[in-house]
Amino acid sequence: MATVSMRDMLQAGVHFGHQTRYWNPKMKPFIFGARNKVHIINLEKTVPMFNEALAELSKISSRKGKILFVGTKRAASEAVKEHALSCDQFFVNHRWLGGMLTNWKTVRQSIKRLKDLEIQSQDGTFDKLTKKEALMRTRELSKLENSLGGIKDMGGLPDALFVVDADHEHIAIKEANNLGIPVFSIVDTNSDPDGVDFIIPGNDDAIRAVSLYLTAVAATVREGRSQDLAQQAEETFAEAE
């Protein structure tokens, strides 16, 4: 299982929180102090909490669990997509649509529409339409791909959420809470940790910090999935004997 050290976190700037005036008092247990009116996160808390989260994510992925990566703000968007794809998982990296989890039935219909449009764009259907109609469908396809492309093959609700910014993604967290889906989240000093099952106190703005979290999570998920595949191979071999 991938692990992250104190040194890795220091180099990535994980310990830098927000300005002290923007703090959420619920994050007090995870704050070491302040420097130049900026809160410093206690990495002695973060390191074991992150590694505990990784261990749990490894268990989920080794049971074929589906993990949804959520990070819709600019600093995280591309990295969220890249790392989710690198471990064959799912992502939302633009806008979180209200009801994405709690109204899955409707979302599933939109995903079906997205897949239908993808087929039409490839089988020549668009070429037979008027320019105006083809343009409208192309725009619809682009819009649906933007919002649902990362979950179109999820095939049902996820088994866990990995969230980059608890404050920014509070709607996603609330929906997961309502459905009993465990939430793993980076929680900065300005955020509310309530509703997060596995809190990872840390900087959620610095690109290097965000990349550090995502790299470790993706590696852990890949490893967990390979354990599952190895176990399947062993069982198949045993049956053959």
UniProtKB/Swiss-Prot annotation:
KW Transmembrane helix (keyword) present: no
GO molecular function per UniProt: structural constituent of ribosome
Leader peptide range in chain numbering: none
Keyword annotations of the record: Ribonucleoprotein, Ribosomal protein
Source organism superkingdom: Bacteria
InterPro entries reported for this sequence: Ribosomal_uS2, Ribosomal_uS2_bac/mit/plastid, Ribosomal_uS2_CS, Ribosomal_uS2_flav_dom_sf
A GO BP annotation: translation
GO cellular component terms listed in the entry, alphabetical order: cytosolic small ribosomal subunit
CDD domains per the UniProt record, alphabetical: RPS2 (cd01425)
PANTHER family named among the record's database cross-references: 30S RIBOSOMAL PROTEIN S2 PROKARYOTIC AND ORGANELLAR, SMALL RIBOSOMAL SUBUNIT PROTEIN US2M
Family: Belongs to the universal ribosomal protein uS2 family.
Protein name: Small ribosomal subunit protein uS2
Source species of the chain: Erwinia tasmaniensis (strain DSM 17950 / CFBP 7177 / CIP 109463 / NCPPB 4357 / Et1/99)
